[in-house]
Amino acid sequence: MGRAEKVILAYSGGVDTSVCIPYLQHEWGVKEVITLAVDLGQGDELEPIRQKALDAGASASLVADAKAEFIRNYAFPAIQANALYENRYPLSTALARPLIAKLLVEAATQYGADAVAHGCTGKGNDQVRFDVAIAALNPNLKVLAPAREWGMSREETIAYGERFGIPAPVKKSSPYSIDRNLLGRSIEAGPLEDPWMEPLEEVYWMTQAIEHTPNSPEYVDIGFEAGVPVSLDGRPLDPVTLVSELNERVGRHGFGRIDMIENRLVGIKSREIYEAPGLLVLIDAHRDLESLTLTADVMHYKRGIEETYSRLVYNGLWYSPLKEALDAFIQQTQQRVTGTVRVKLFKGTARVVGRQSPYSLYTPDLATYGAEDQFDHRAAEGFIYVWGLPTRVWAEKLRQG
């Protein structure tokens, strides 16, 4: 008896997920494999990918355009949370996994499949993100992960595929492992496994080298409504267009590269290179607008929530009770995070140089040091006395021994 009757396979068109098709059928006795390729803005032509799955033995090959849903329902909430794993990684890849898992589960329901499958290995974070998300959405659905069990090298995987008519890659395989979507790119493996080695320029695609960036700065005004990006330079834009345009404009000036040692969920450290020009600028701009519109106590408390939120998403707990609770808090804080942030792009930098909001809590007459100052300086003495009282009591007791 096979491990499943009918399987929905998350499909990218690469060697591993292509080999999963005959492997599931011939090694694990799956009677029917239906592939699902999800368009998240990775730039691949999806019709050739769909045909490739059919040629590899899939009984049906599905394609889902999920770009708008990806940005609106996954990226924008993460921007509202200022989500940066370990204060650096904006979760560009991690955010895609719960959406793909959701679409897999929906396809399984629609086509009556008793299992879903993915091509993740046993070493990365994505296997956790897929398996846990699928379990949260449908705990009765089996999850199959052939690449986690088959134990084949890259060469053996290619040879196995050739037995079933899956052609070997035409060009020499890149030494890098690359994942891409509309939010950015992640690059790892190959020469990058040496943490001392500077990445070659060939690894980058979305961001220009500094020496090739414009010699004049560019300004972009980003409009937000309730914490959600809605416009560039006063032009209302749909989510996909907004992120796409910002990627191009920011990347042209060389901003958006991350080179970090990252703590994976499975317990190992890995060297990761990321490109996320638009996403990083949106997070920076959003955080700055919050500094203008949130009270100090809410803003400071939210920073701790953001760290927990980022860790949950990175660790595959998008669909979890704690994540839902954090979502509720974050949404409450965003009601007045509305306004415009001006960002200056120049030679690998993206700096906020202006911000305005109809809900601004900044009061010039209180902040100024000029003649129009309305702050009551006489009130400071009493405040300082009360504020410093615990410290004075502590110091007195310390002197008394």
Curated annotation (Swiss-Prot):
Record's keyword annotation contains Amino-acid biosynthesis:
yes
Location within or outside the cell: Cytoplasm
Q: Name one GO cellular component term.
A: cytoplasm
Q: What is its main location?
A: cytoplasm
The protein's superkingdom reads Bacteria
- The UniProt entry's coiled-coil ranges are none
InterPro entries recorded for this chain?
Answer: Arginosuc_syn_C (IPR048268), Arginosuc_syn_N (IPR048267), Arginosuc_synth (IPR001518), Arginosuc_synth_CS (IPR018223), Arginosuc_synth_type_1_subfam (IPR023434), AS_cat/multimer_dom_body (IPR024074), Rossmann-like_a/b/a_fold (IPR014729)
Reaction(s) this enzyme catalyzes, per UniProt: L-citrulline + L-aspartate + ATP = 2-(N(omega)-L-arginino)succinate + AMP + diphosphate + H(+)
Describe which pathway this protein belongs to, using the record's wording.
Amino-acid biosynthesis; L-arginine biosynthesis; L-arginine from L-ornithine and carbamoyl phosphate: step 2/3
- Please give the NCBIfam families that the UniProt record associates with this protein: argG (TIGR00032), PRK00509.1 (NF001770)
Report what the protein is called. Argininosuccinate synthase
Write down the species: Thermosynechococcus vestitus (strain NIES-2133 / IAM M-273 / BP-1)
- Gene name, per UniProt, is argG
